[in-house]
Amino acid sequence: MASLLHKFLENASGKKGQDLASTAYLAALDHLLHSFPSIGKSVIDELKSQRSRLKMIASENYSSISVQLAMGNLLTDKYCEGSPFKRFYSCCENVDAIEWECAETAKELFGAESAFVQPHSGADANLLAIMAIITQKIQGPAVKRLGYKTINDLTDKEYAELKAEIGSHVCLGPSLNSGGHLTHGNVRLNVMSKLMRCLPYEVSKKTELFDYAEIARLVRTHKPTVLIAGYSSYSRRLNFSILKQIADDCGAVLWVDMAHFAGLVAGGVFVEEENPIPFADIVTTTTHKTLRGPRGGLMLSTKEYEGMINRACPLMMGGPLPHVIAAKAIALKEALTVDFKKYAHQVVDNARTLAEHFQKHGLRLLTGGTDNHMLIIDLTSLGIPGNVAEDILSSVGIAVNRNTIPSDSEGVWRTSGIRLGTPALTSLGMGSDEMEEVANIIVKVLRNITLRRNADDNFSKSEGELPENIAQEAKARVADLLARFPLYPEIDLETLV
């Protein structure tokens, strides 16, 4: 039986545009399929799955084949605890070169004073941020006040008192229902809430926007050590100049989590006061989402925090992932291009177009629209919870995620909303015409969902139904869009048997 690679090369023979990247990609799949069939099949099935759905989960995107290839090599075998040129292991010169180049590229891309590229995820970056702030602003001064050089010099009693002092300091951040992330400290199940006294600020009940005057009032009242700004489900931009002034007025550290909108900063969409880099003390982000890189984290900071962040090992990290850092470097270089800037602007244009068509059809959007890459539909008037809408849309080939809304009566599992994003569809090349078609499909599906009745004749809050004719029409329209805008068109699915 001919291998995948052989079939691919036969089909590609004589065709223009054949490149090494797609050949290498197929060679890797070919090897996995023959040597470890179950794993290889699952990888291929995932490729087929992603090519059969409109990916509209706001936190997901598509990375380039170059980014993916960078992670599949012997860099994964190298331990390199520490920072470039200051490792706890020998023979790290090649990893040093890659990490240094990655950090320098990040500084160039974002105009930052310092960059740290080791975090394995956005959650790791956020944990490192709070640990660096605690160490710099609370622990360090306390050790010095007691007349010691390091924390290891403290007695057990003094150390216990220091931990209690740290726990009394306030961290003020956006609540989960107002668009914050669980790592912003206001979810008690998360480790962040166990480090400091974490308090939330909310969006306005009237406008569903963050109220800077209210945030300033809370800051004056609670005098936080840390003010967190950022979001995972908020469809507007933030004014970081105002937030910096609010933080400075009480001496708080301004930490911005831009995991969702880093690509819009890199692409020059968010500028001046909407760009957090000139205002924040520490900025954290993921490298996937709107940046289109590998799954991972990244930190940017002022020089004040550079030394502490670079001591992530032993502060909270062990060995970094050099193969992922190599992929981050490639993604950051891709983000420096003119094409990426065009992409970033199109992401926002597409989100606005999508929002306009939803509103034209009478759907209610949180905040009344969007000016970033995402939007949140309030399903309350339709009488269906977010989990049901998510499942039904998935069944017709549209991937979205359920999402809480302010004062959500359905809770975090069912929710009263769904969140949609345009980064992935924009990566496929879709524009305003396609956004209109997508909106029309989604509206028709949502308006035809009914809740199933349980055995006791009550409506289910976990299962819904869609008329078969509506479902088939939606599937056909989704398939047409995907056929016109295929994922990785250079990878011929006909060879993946």
UniProtKB/Swiss-Prot annotation:
Q: Extract one GO BP annotation from the record.
A: glycine biosynthetic process from serine
The pathway it acts in is:
One-carbon metabolism; tetrahydrofolate interconversion; Amino-acid biosynthesis; glycine biosynthesis; glycine from L-serine: step 1/1
Q: Taking the first listed entry, what is the main subcellular location of this protein, grouped into a coarse class?
A: cytoplasm
Q: What is this enzyme's class at the first EC digit? A: transferase
GO MF, any single term: glycine hydroxymethyltransferase activity
**GO CC, any one term:** cytosol
Its needed co-factors are:
pyridoxal 5'-phosphate
Which PROSITE patterns does this one have?
Answer: SHMT
How is the quaternary structure described?
Answer: Homodimer.
Site (Plays an important role in substrate specificity) location in chain? 288
Q: Where in the cell is it found?
A: Cytoplasm
- Gene3D superfamilies (alphabetical): Aspartate Aminotransferase, domain 1 (3.90.1150.10), Type I PLP-dependent aspartate aminotransferase-like (Major domain) (3.40.640.10)
Q: Which reaction does it catalyse?
A: (6R)-5,10-methylene-5,6,7,8-tetrahydrofolate + glycine + H2O = (6S)-5,6,7,8-tetrahydrofolate + L-serine
EC numbers, comma separated? 2.1.2.1
Protein name per its UniProtKB record: Serine hydroxymethyltransferase
Record's SUPFAM superfamilies? PLP-dependent transferases
What keywords would UniProt list here? Amino-acid biosynthesis, Cytoplasm, One-carbon metabolism, Pyridoxal phosphate, Transferase
Binding, (6S)-5,6,7,8-tetrahydrofolate: 176, 180-182
